[in-house]
Amino acid sequence: IRAKIFLCFLVPILFLILVGVFSYKKAAAGMYDTFRDSNEQTINMANQYLDVSNSFIEAEALKYAFQSDLGKYMIGLYETDAVQRKTVINSVGSSIRASQAGNDFISNIHIVTEEDVQMLSTKAGGTVMGIYKDYKNEMLGYSDNGKKIPEWVDYHNTLDDTLGLKQSDYIMAYQTTPQSGKGFIVIDVKASAIQQFLDSLDMGDGSIIGFVTQSGREIISEKLPDGQESTRADGETVFYGQDFFNNLEDQQTTKEVSINGKSYLFFYSRMERTNAAVCALVPMEIVNGQADDIRNVTIAVVLIACVVAVLIGIIISTGIQKNMKRISGRLEEVAEGNLTTKVSVKGHDEFNTVSYTHLRAHETLANL
């Protein structure tokens, strides 16, 4: 009887386990999709925000490219007119400083002129003459075909050496030529502004968010738990050069990757304007964290249900066994001829009815 009772309790428990497993899988799948979609939106919005910021930088550069007086100054037409030359220098100098102050993403603005013409820049320093030819030759080296100078570049070493610029101050630069065709307006994108923006994004403890340029320069923001320090070495790339990053053709990608034996969800969104990308690595333990909580609760509920069912089964089966022993024991006494015995059972169930029926039968037999 005890085994049958346990079996009766076991069947609903098995169904409870199946319901728990099904619920966990559905919850895990739903939370995974929700988490993935939410973070894809975060990365895409970050991409769009930075892309819009870059469009403002392009517009700022084009503003100077179409200034007639500046174009004439850059090719040396005002070198014989000291008054006009000074007027242009002061006017453009004030204007580029105002542009720098008005846009948090602008590090510096440089006006690269012909060799015999003074350059203009927001970078403080003395009088520096133009480096147009050397600068152009460097930029042609970055060109895909050796002819067309790229608009967005990650480095301008010639300009850095000439003006004493630090490459850590900018992450990339936009450049365009004036209407005259000689000279460059160069605007550096401030690395610290992008770093601050990436730091404002929150994708969970242990996640890594990065801005990666076309040639592999990176700005990385690590979301470390309290008290934990970064193990990344200075200059070490997180995304560029990795197998999961190389040869990505789609503009947007999300996939699971493994790094040093640890699973991550990789998000990637590339900008059309600059070919730079916003990327993120989110530990899978964060992705599945809430679903794991549901799994743990389900396991706990099932275990408690099993324990309660076993205890109830033991109590019921024990009561049945005791009553069965009392009844069978008294029946054996009657069978041996003892008509004075009485059957007494505990409870108000069917065994009590059996006991009463046995008592009536016993009394009738005794009267006979």
Sequence positions of predicted segments:
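Solvent-exposed, extracytoplasmic
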Residues: S91-A101, S180, F184-G227
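Short, hydrophobic beta-strand elements of compact beta-sandwich sensory domains
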Residues: T176, G181-A191, Y264-A291, R295
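Cytoplasm-proximal transmembrane signaling helix
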Residues: F211, R273, A277-A335, K342-V343
